[in-house]
Amino acid sequence: MNTNKYLAEMIGTFWLTFAGCGSAVIAAGFPQVGIGLVGVSLAFGLSVVTMAYAIGHISGCHLNPAVTLGLAAGGRFPVKQIAPYIIAQVLGAIAAAALLYLIASGAAGFDLAKGFASNGYGAHSPGQYNLVACFVMEVVMTMMFLFVIMGSTHGKAPAGFAPLAIGLALVMIHLVSIPVTNTSVNPARSTGPALFVGGWAIGQLWLFWVAPLLGGVLGGVIYRVLSPEPTGVVEGVKAR
């Protein structure tokens, strides 16, 4: 069994969670020079771009259970690899959240009650959006994310541009949905911070598994019907 791809997924998801959530926890509201919503959106997108070039040839650079499941639904990824990929991704996200907590808690005034980049709905949505609105947003955003991934890694797509297209798509997704759910589209990314916040974050975590996984499957299936891959099974950005 080749464990390199699982280790690559763990490291890649660690980077996405640490860089993305870290930008929100540490840098977003920093006095005078805080990066704000746009900066956080860019951090998440850039984390995917950089990892796609770093580990795309090893694991396909999924970094996200919804991407793994969506690619499988789209005929681009072997079903037997779904579970180990997701386990590796979740472990990477938890490790990132642990390191982020270690660093962030070293600042005076640090308070987990501020959310620690967790995702939420209702009273815990940044814009106080209700459960239905948050669920729909996560499904649609993840569906479109998979649509871009499937398209940019298709055998007929221009070679070499998939990481940029995927990263920019994630930036756009965050720009739209941070006010609604604080943007998940990634169950692993949601799980890491939620475990440290506890309470409401864990109680609401179900939505940030169910909605992204559903959206991922929808995106994969729809693109598979729209434009079947002529070259067989690939593993994400690996083939491009």
From Swiss-Prot:
GO terms for molecular function: water channel activity. It comes from the Bacteria. Its main location: membrane. PROSITE patterns: MIP. The chain crosses the membrane at residues 10-30, 35-55, 90-110, 131-151, 160-180, 202-222. Keywords: Cell inner membrane, Cell membrane, Membrane, Repeat, Transmembrane, Transmembrane helix, Transport. A motif (NPA 2) lies at residues 186-188. InterPro entries: Aquaporin-like (IPR023271), Aquaporin_transptr (IPR034294), Aquaporin_Z (IPR023743), MIP (IPR000425), MIP_CS (IPR022357). It catalyses: H2O(in) = H2O(out). It is found in: Cell inner membrane. It is a multi-pass membrane protein. Belongs to the MIP/aquaporin (TC 1.A.8) family. Aquaporins contain two tandem repeats each containing three membrane-spanning domains and a pore-forming loop with the signature motif Asn-Pro-Ala (NPA). Homotetramer. This is Aquaporin Z. It comes from Rhodopseudomonas palustris (strain ATCC BAA-98 / CGA009).
